[in-house]
Curated annotation (Swiss-Prot):
PTM-bearing positions, type Phosphoserine: 201, 230
Reaction equations catalysed: L-seryl-[protein] + ATP = O-phospho-L-seryl-[protein] + ADP + H(+); L-threonyl-[protein] + ATP = O-phospho-L-threonyl-[protein] + ADP + H(+)
Spans within the Extracellular topological domain: 1-8
Chain residues that bind ATP: 81-89, 103
Protein's recorded name: Receptor-like serine/threonine-protein kinase At1g78530
Family designation: Belongs to the protein kinase superfamily. Ser/Thr protein kinase family.
Species this chain originates from: Arabidopsis thaliana
Length: 355
């Protein structure tokens, strides 16, 4: 009898200790989360019922909220840099030395609001040389604003398909930089991030022509132990992986496929939905695979790259091979972005050692 009571006593003590331990751990995690957000965010109300939140940004901290909103209210169509995802992006000039890219998101549904907050959670602590920095945001009952650093050379899309020719060295460097940015989102962010809309217009170019991955309006957070998510279908025709149309599920391997299309775009100088392809009822990927099947790979390379050195031609062939790996119909066969980065970086090392 005494042994039974003693056993019950020890069991009770163990259960109580276990519960208290869980509570203590939960409190520690909460304090850590609160301290982290207190350090990185500085929110204050703005006239009109809105609230501005600034992440650690010396550039944004030097601008008063009243000045920022005053400038924002003067934005017009002439300030538009582009549209896509959930909203429109404007160039916001504060003074001669301070300029931002501001993305305006029209609020209207709870689903869109959830997407907005999910985006902020994903972007708040992301700091990488190949990802566009989010300086802060403004939220109000009528609309939301995301405040980014401005990329002076615009998007890869506008640069690649514009009047200025982009040499191979620049294209290769952009490919490597974009791959590093996407790899960081996939494998180094916690939770991991699936971009869902990798395309040339979402790869921006800084003052050094370095690639910066942008537009997380369509980004989806993924817990580390998940292999896919199923929310709304998003993406851009010509870049979407074939399985996306069957399942509606966004995956990392879907992003890899989209990046493969970007590599083809860099090699061919052609848009995935070029008018010529549209007239023939096809797209860039289908055309390239047909050319490979006919063993006419030489027609793939952009005419503006003709006359490149022997070393550069070898690099183009190697990048073409990596693009085809990314475009494998079976997702499981495609390489992870970490592997894509290694393959792209190895090209320079191998070609240098050969010459």
């Amino acid at each position: 009898m005494a042994n039974a009571k003693e056993t019950t006593f020890y069991i009770t003590i163990s259960v109580v200790a276990f519960v208290i331990g869980k509570i203590v751990i939960a409190l520690l995690f909460y304090k850590r989360w609160k301290r982290k957000h207190t350090i990185h965010e500085n929110g204050f109300p703005v006239k009109g019922g809105g609230k501005m939140v600034m992440f650690r940004s010396q550039l944004l901290n030097s601008v008063s909220s009243d000045m920022f909103m005053k400038k924002t209210h003067k934005l017009s169509n002439k300030d538009i840099l582009g549209s896509g995802g959930f909203g429109t992006v404007y160039r916001l000039v504060i003074d001669d030395s301070t300029t931002f890219a501001v993305k305006r998101l029209n609020r209207g549904t709870s689903e869109r609001d959830r997407g907005f907050h999910r985006e902020l959670e994903a972007m708040a602590d992301i700091k990488h040389r190949n990802i566009v920095t989010l300086h802060g945001y403004f939220t109000s009952p009528h609309y939301n604003l995301l405040i980014y650093e401005l990329m002076p050379n615009g998007s890869l899309d506008s640069f690649l398909h514009g009047r200025k020719a982009l040499d191979w060295a620049s294209r290769y460097r952009i490919a490597v930089g974009a791959a590093r940015g996407i790899s960081y989102l996939h494998h180094d962010c916690i939770p991991h991030i699936i971009h869902r809309d990798i395309k040339s217009s979402n790869i921006l170019l800084d003052h050094n022509m370095e690639a910066r991955v942008s537009d997380f309006g369509l980004a989806t957070l993924m817990e580390p132990d998940k292999t896919h998510v199923s929310t709304f279908v998003a993406g851009t025709f010509g870049y979407l992986a074939p399985e996306y149309f069957d399942t509606g599920k966004a995956t990392m391997k879907g992003d890899v496929y989209s990046f493969g299309v970007v590599l083809l775009e860099l090699l061919t100088g052609r848009k995935p939905t070029d008018d010529e392809f549209f007239e023939e009822g096809t797209k860039l990927v289908t055309w390239v695979k047909g050319v490979v099947r006919d063993q006419r790979e030489e027609v793939v390379i952009d005419n503006r790259l003709r006359g490149s050195s022997v070393q550069e031609n070898e690099e183009m062939n190697d990048v073409f091979g990596i693009a085809m790996m990314c475009l494998e119909p079976e997702p499981a066969i495609r390489p992870a972005m970490t592997e894509v980065v290694k393959l792209l970086e190895y090209i320079k090392l191998s070609t240098r050692s050969s010459f």
